[in-house]
Design a protein with these regions (language model features):
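FAD-binding core/adjacent interface of flavoenzyme oxidoreductases
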Residues: 1-9, 67-156, 232-240, 251, ...
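Beta1-alpha1 glycine-rich phosphate/pyrophosphate-binding loop at the start
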Residues: 4-68, 72, 144, 148, ...
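A Rossmann-like FAD-binding core segment of flavoenzymes
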Residues: 68-97, 174-261, 355-387
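Predominantly flavin-linked oxidoreductase catalytic cores and closely associated redox partners
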Residues: 104-105, 111-208, 213-222, 289, ...
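FAD-site-proximal beta/loop scaffold in flavoenzymes
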Residues: 114, 136-146, 249-300
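Mid-to-C-terminal Rossmann-like scaffold of FAD/NAD(P)H-dependent oxidoreductases
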Residues: 304, 312-384
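Exposed aromatic-hydrophobic patches
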Residues: 360, 392-404
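Short, aromatic- and glycine-rich surface loops/edge beta-strands on solvent-exposed regions
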Residues: 372, 402-420
Length: 420
């Protein structure tokens, strides 16, 4: 059995950034395992621009952004395996994988970084009524067909869900000559970034219908029409509000789910809100030496944030490999309440964390003219006003190690939404 200091499951933006960071922090024995035929992950099919503004201070396409991190990995001589599927990860950091060249094989790692990304919610998970004809795709599948395979999924399109991929595909299909009839969103707010709503829908006069969902799909061999209806506060269709659209394609952009089947096999505890691992300030899970970063941890808005998080995971994994398990330190829980759905990380160690720590979270509804309040126990520490907050846009709070040191008896940190 081969042994490595660090094994990274996933060769997308998170895995690449984590590998480069670990190498820069003194770890030479690294293996990246990627199930696709090339490194780069989902970025290879994201040919639109908007990437890299935070990381490189310039606007790049997805493949351009990926290529920069691929070059970092190649320049550092980091080993990787393509077309290789990880089958199991054990709590003692034994990774079982398989490919055509090696068959099924095992590698033993001193530390493992989970960077598997996320998957789209399928039609089966949505329980959409109607027939099951050809022409129903997830937005990501349609994106791959158009941008990488050179196939056009359809000519008249209805999109269910206003996640970022759905919004971007509304624009992409329009640019390729299709007619996007409508984008329907179950919730009373969009699930995507405000800039994508403006650039992908408003600029192309594509209607967005909030609080609407698909109630029927017509067609036996191919989609012929889709009926949408308004939903009430209980998210159930309101009779008499149905609208029928003739179309040959239905795209689904109804949320992303972190790919954590392997995490479960290792015994990693998952957050029921994010469906991703519960981590501390070093992005370490409840299993010693297993770290998580990127969309497998929680779904991000920007790949730049994924790279920042993954670089931190790589550095922290390197420290673990060189120094062993960190000494037992006081653990403080971060509590998300009053409009805050979750926080990443969930736990911090005030004496062991970096000088500053970014805590990222999402709100549960649209808030206007409110503030993000941070409490140490019951004492208000900071209150930052925000004109608008929405579930589609990630928020953050910066914790200062020096400030935390002033509260040696701290038992909890609370982050909540309050009136400004």
């Amino acid at each position: 059995m081969n042994t490595y200091d660090l094994v990274i499951d996933g060769g997308g933006p998170a895995g690449l950034a984590a590998a480069a960071s670990a190498k820069d922090h003194g770890i030479d024995s690294i293996l990246i395992i990627e199930r696709d035929k090339e490194l780069g992950g989902i970025l290879n099919q994201c040919i639109h621009n908007g990437f890299g503004l935070h990381t490189f201070k310039e606007e790049l396409t997805g493949p351009e952004y990926a290529s920069r991190f691929i070059d970092m990995v190649l320049d550092r001589g980091i080993e990787y395996k393509l077309n290789t599927m990880v089958m199991d990860i054990s709590a003692d950091k034994k990774v079982t994988a398989m490919n055509r060249e090696d068959g099924m094989f095992e590698v033993q790692a001193k530390a493992v970084i989970l960077a598997m990304g996320c998957r789209e919610r399928s039609r089966g998970a949505l329980n959409i009524p109607g027939y099951r004809p050809a022409g129903i795709y997830s937005a990501g599948t349609a994106q791959r067909l158009v941008n990488m395979e050179g196939y056009m999924p359809g000519k008249e399109v209805v999109i269910l869900g206003s996640g970022d991929i759905g919004l971007i595909m509304a624009r992409r299909m329009t640019l390729e000559g299709a007619k996007v009839k409508v984008v329907a969103e179950l919730m009373p707010y969009s699930g995507g970034l405000k800039r994508n709503i403006v650039q992908c829908l408003n600029d192309f006069d594509i209607p967005l219908k909030l609080s609407h969902t698909v109630v029927d799909i017509e067609g036996k061999n191919r989609v012929e029409a889709v009926t949408i209806a308004e939903v009430g506060s209980d998210r159930k269709p309101i009779p008499g509000t149905e609208e029928r659209y003739t179309c040959d394609t239905l795209l689904l952009s109804c949320g992303l789910i972190p790919e954590n089947e392997l995490s479960k096999s290792a015994g990693v505890a998952l957050n029921p809100v994010t469906s991703g691992p519960v981590v501390n300030d070093s992005l370490e899970t409840n299993i010693d030496g297993i770290f998580a970063c990127g969309n497998v941890l929680h779904v991000h808005d920007l790949v730049d944030y994924v790279s920042q998080e993954a670089s931190a995971a790589g550095k922290n994994a390197a420290n673990y490999i060189k120094n062993g398990k960190e000494k037992d330190a006081k653990i403080v829980e971060i509590l998300p309440v009053d409009g805050v759905r979750y926080t990443v990380p969930k736990y911090i160690r005030p004496t062991e964390m970096d000088d500053t720590l970014t805590v990222r979270f999402r709100v549960g509804a649209v808030y206007k003219n409110c503030a993000i309040a941070t409490y140490f126990d019951d004492q208000l520490i900071s209150k930052r006003k925000r004109p608008v907050m929405a579930p589609g846009e990630m928020e953050q709070v910066i914790l200062d190690k020096k400030k935390l040191g002033e509260y040696p008896d701290l038992s909890k940190i609370t982050i909540k939404i309050e009136e400004a």
